[in-house]
């Protein structure tokens, strides 16, 4: 009998695809089951039904995996943050390695050295930034501060025992939640467009211990935050509190953005050390959220580039210039291009902080700016956002004829599409290595080393 949307079916998970999408078959029809793991038998409700595939949501696990372990976090299963805390870490790495390789196989990309995946140095308490949301689990319920509940668009579950951040985060969260519960201030409701409390964003530099607390609200209520500031200052920190901020965000979207920034205490940035260099991180600037993992990731990039003393390196989608600056001490010249002006300003500031005189950072759309750059690169580093490299930018990357390209990807699906274009235009994939920056989640970074055919 044909599968129908809304109906429930018993399914055996046989395969897995990125990002942590279990694959089952029903009468020959491929069914994608989110967070299903091969070996499980599940009861799933069909949410989407197309001619060539269906999508299902797990209602119940009927037969589980023999190697499952107990998750450390009491909110696991209810919280939408972590997917695999109940799977041993070695198995998590095995799954991610398999998912990357399968994507390369499907894209008919082969002939490269597929290196073992690198695990995160820390499986727990690894994050240097966390964005918590104010809300309630059920409409009209008690104020919560934490993560979106699993499978719910608006429900928020408190993350007071979150295990992917350290004790300082948990103490700040609990102090904040207790204070605002007592004050009975309303959280922002995105559909009604009303309320005050939006987010609590905490950044903590792993290697320096500097802590920055950022309370995000609307301007709908004029509330004095002096008492709150003193409460946050009075916490017994393992690290070092350097700033408390109040960000006004009246945007209609769910994204944390800044309409106005007030410094309640200290300063509005932290300094992080990575591989002997210093990086200034501002409230909204992008920075890899796993510092110890980032050191490993950037070491892999440096290794893939190889000897670079006489080389000009292009760092495209450079953000705050982290990768470019880490290779700069060994390079002749580094040119970074980034769309976000604030990130470029941070990159320039960081280069000064590190006494690097061979770095130039340009703000603008890569697809446009790349046309105007006169220098010829010996190495191009690509580190694009999830959608991959813009097709126009990729055309210019190819025209530059760089002997070496190192592609750092946070989305292996778009990575393989870009690699197909590079291979069609004279590049050979030499090596591929996964790097797990996000234990217990489906996400994985992939580093790819390419060489132009005529340089081999």
UniProtKB/Swiss-Prot annotation:
It is an enzyme of class 2 (transferase). [4Fe-4S] cluster binds at residues 73, 79, 82, 162. GO terms for molecular function: 4 iron, 4 sulfur cluster binding; metal ion binding; rRNA (uridine-C5-)-methyltransferase activity. The active site is at residue 410. Its EC number is 2.1.1.-. Keywords: 4Fe-4S, Iron, Iron-sulfur, Metal-binding, Methyltransferase, S-adenosyl-L-methionine, Transferase. Residues 2-60 form the TRAM domain. Pfam families: TRAM (PF01938), tRNA_U5-meth_tr (PF05958). One of its GO terms (biological process) is rRNA base methylation. S-adenosyl-L-methionine binds at residues 288, 317, 338, 383. Belongs to the class I-like SAM-binding methyltransferase superfamily. RNA M5U methyltransferase family. This is Uncharacterized RNA methyltransferase CTC_01941. It comes from Clostridium tetani (strain Massachusetts / E88).
């Amino acid at each position: 009998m044909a599968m129908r949307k809304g109906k429930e079916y018993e399914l055996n998970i046989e395969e897995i695809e990125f990002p942590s999408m279990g694959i089952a078959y029903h009468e020959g029809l491929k069914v994608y089951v989110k967070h299903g793991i091969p070996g499980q038998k599940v009861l799933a409700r069909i949410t989407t039904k197309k001619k060539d595939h269906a999508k299902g949501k797990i209602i119940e696990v009927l037969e589980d995996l023999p190697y499952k372990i107990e998750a450390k976090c009491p909110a696991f299963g209810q919280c939408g943050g972590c997917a695999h805390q109940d799977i041993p870490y070695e198995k998590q790495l095995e799954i991610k390695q398999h998912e990357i390789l399968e994507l390369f196989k499907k894209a008919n990309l082969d002939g490269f050295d597929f290196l073992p995946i690198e695990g995160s140095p820390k499986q727990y308490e690894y994050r240097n930034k966390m964005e918590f949301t104010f809300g309630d689990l059920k409409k009209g319920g008690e104020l919560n501060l934490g993560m979106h509940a699993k499978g719910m668009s608006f429900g928020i579950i408190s993350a007071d025992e979150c295990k992917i951040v350290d004790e300082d985060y948990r103490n700040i969260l609990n102090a904040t939640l207790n204070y605002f519960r007592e004050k009975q201030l309303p959280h922002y409701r995105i559909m009604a467009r009303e309320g005050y409390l939006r987010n609590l964003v905490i950044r903590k530099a792993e290697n320096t211990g500097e802590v920055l607390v950022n309370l995000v609200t609307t301007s709908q209520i004029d509330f004095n935050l002096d008492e709150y500031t003193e409460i946050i200052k009075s916490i017994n920190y393992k690290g070092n509190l350097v700033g408390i901020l109040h960000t006004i965000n009246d945007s209609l979207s769910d994204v944390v953005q800044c309409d106005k920034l007030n410094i309640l205490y200290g300063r509005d940035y932290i300094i992080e050390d990575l591989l002997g260099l210093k990086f200034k991180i501002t409230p909204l600037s992008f920075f890899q959220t796993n510092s110890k993992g980032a050191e490993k990731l950037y070491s892999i990039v440096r290794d893939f580039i190889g000897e670079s003393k006489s080389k000009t390196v292009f760092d495209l989608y450079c953000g705050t210039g982290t990768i470019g600056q880490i290779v700069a001490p060994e390079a002749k010249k580094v040119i970074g291009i980034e769309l976000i002006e604030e990130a470029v300003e941070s990159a320039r500031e960081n280069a000064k902080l590190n006494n690097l005189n061979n770095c130039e950072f340009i703000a603008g759309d890569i697809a446009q700016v790349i046309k105007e750059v006169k220098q010829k690169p010996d190495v191009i580093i690509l580190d694009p956002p999830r959608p991959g490299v813009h097709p126009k930018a990729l055309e210019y990357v190819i025209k530059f004829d760089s002997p070496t390209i190192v592609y750092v990807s946070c989305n292996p699906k778009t990575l393989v599409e870009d690699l197909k274009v590079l291979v069609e235009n004279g590049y050979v994939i030499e090596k591929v290595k996964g790097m797990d920056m996000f234990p217990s989640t489906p996400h994985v970074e992939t580093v790819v080393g390419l060489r132009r055919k005529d340089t081999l």
